[in-house]
Amino acid sequence: MASPRELTQNPLKKIWMPYSNGRPALHASQRGVCMTNCPTLIVMVGLPARGKTYISKKLTRYLNWIGVPTREFNVGQYRRDIVKTYKSFEFFLPDNEEGLKIRKQCALAALSDVRKFLSEEGGHVAVFDATNTTRERRAMIFNFGEQNGYKTFFVESICVDPEVVAANIVQVKLGSPDYVNRDSDEATEDFMRRIECYENSYESLDEDLDRDLSYIKIMDVGQSYVVNRVADHIQSRIVYYLMNIHVTPRSIYLCRHGESELNLKGRIGGDPGLSPRGREFSKHLAQFISDQNIKDLKVWTSQMKRTIQTAEALSVPYEQWKVLNEIDAGVCEEMTYEEIQDHYPLEFALRDQDKYRYRYPKGESYEDLVQRLEPVIMELERQENVLVICHQAVMRCLLAYFLDKAAEELPYLKCPLHTVLKLTPVAYGCKVESIFLNVAAVNTHRDRPQNVDISRPSEEALVTVPAHQ
């Protein structure tokens, strides 16, 4: 029996790792065996204009945000790359042999890219976005998954409510490259005919015929669900997420607390109260929210004094969430950046090298914060109009989710004090409106310096530190 390997603490993440010959030991990949962490192939199912691409994009964004490398493969885009100019619905007729040949070629090209992503590039989840309306096509994709050691999970979107279908058709017509510069009525007519091309051969997932498959069926954008054979943790998270999202029009308002006494001094963390300007901002925020005349607005804060003081000025009920508390800076709490550089120069440099994954000694990383904030995202997806009064790092994490920002970009998103961001979800993304409430505040944003080397001089480490008292 081999002797136990030596452990050493990773300086960036502060986790213990086995070492071999002075180097971190890597876990052997066992992709051929379907373990809990083997790749997952999500297969969309449904007629056109049923919200499949909306679901695909939203699911991809969520999984990437929680740290699961995910990519969407839209077969329609592969078709557009091959057939440069879309002419009419006749391309999709079941007796159009040339069309059938090209569509199959596109599906196989997309699956080839799925294999490359999951088996060679370190991807964990691939979302295969196409109609996949026949049992034969789904069997082909399932076999592809089995041959490559992937778990396959089907997501079917069914819409029978004519109002939902009509709304989806408008969204598709507005956003599809197939109908750019086409007359609106002509585009609608063509798209309706395209849907008819699929309807006669459409075979929905069946509780008896498909009882061995893992799937979720979503009826009328979340009115009801059928869930079958959820196989592992990642599939259960996918189901939970899909059962929380909705398409009701709403806005989410994000802002930080008013300027705090420690903000003025350039000190991070702590639990200080508001500065005089911070209290002034609270009054301006109350007036802004009143002027917006928002129906059934929910207000959430952290459990820290500065967010609660800010919310008190609104004179409305609010809910305190511990998970909305600011990132825990551990041993660096209430220190200035200059003091951190002076006392912990190695830590300061490591954080600049990888700000997302760096964990403060006895504290948290942005990566930890994202995991902590997942329940907030789930609840924001369930709710309608919400104002979240939070903190700089927390606001960055929430903003990165809604704007689909990469982990490397997340810790540098600008979230200034005394500014409200109004987020309005739209078809395949989020519209952002930034509203400054005309109360001056200190700048707390620090850009990544050019020199992130451990041996850098102090003046180069501190070059991007904002001015403070």
From Swiss-Prot:
Chain residue ranges for the region called Fructose-2,6-bisphosphatase: 250-469
Give me the reactions it catalyses.
beta-D-fructose 2,6-bisphosphate + H2O = beta-D-fructose 6-phosphate + phosphate; beta-D-fructose 6-phosphate + ATP = beta-D-fructose 2,6-bisphosphate + ADP + H(+)
Q: What is its EC number?
A: 2.7.1.105, 3.1.3.46
Residues binding ATP are 46-54, 168-173, 348-351, 392-396, 428
Q: Locate the residues binding beta-D-fructose 2,6-bisphosphate.
A: R256, N263, G269, R306, Y337, R351, K355, Y366, Q392, R396
Q: Which residues carry this modification: Phosphoserine?
A: S29
UniProt keywords, alphabetically: ATP-binding, Hydrolase, Kinase, Multifunctional enzyme, Nucleotide-binding, Phosphoprotein, Transferase
Q: In what way is its activity controlled? A: The most important regulatory mechanism of these opposing activities is by phosphorylation and dephosphorylation of the enzyme.
SUPFAM superfamilies the record matches: P-loop containing nucleoside triphosphate hydrolases, Phosphoglycerate mutase-like
Q: Give the matching PROSITE patterns.
A: PG_MUTASE (PS00175)
Residues with Phosphothreonine modification: T444
What are the binding positions for beta-D-fructose 6-phosphate in this chain?
A: R79, R103, T131, R137, K173, R194, Y198
> Record's InterPro entries?
6Pfruct_kin (IPR003094), 6Phosfructo_kin (IPR013079), His_Pase_superF_clade-1 (IPR013078), His_PPase_superfam (IPR029033), P-loop_NTPase (IPR027417), PG/BPGM_mutase_AS (IPR001345)
| GO BP annotation list | fructose 2,6-bisphosphate metabolic process; fructose metabolic process
Where are the stretches annotated 6-phosphofructo-2-kinase? 1-249
Pfam families from the UniProt entry: 6PF2K (PF01591), His_Phos_1 (PF00300)
Which residues lie in coiled coils? none
Any one GO MF annotation of this record: 6-phosphofructo-2-kinase activity
Active site at D129, C159, H257 (tele-phosphohistidine intermediate), E326 (proton donor/acceptor)
* Residues the record marks as site: Transition state stabilizer: H391
Self-association and partners: Homodimer.
Q: What does this protein do?
A: Synthesis and degradation of fructose 2,6-bisphosphate.
Tell me the protein family, please.
Answer: In the C-terminal section; belongs to the phosphoglycerate mutase family.
Record-given protein name: 6-phosphofructo-2-kinase/fructose-2,6-bisphosphatase 4
Name the gene that codes for it.
Pfkfb4
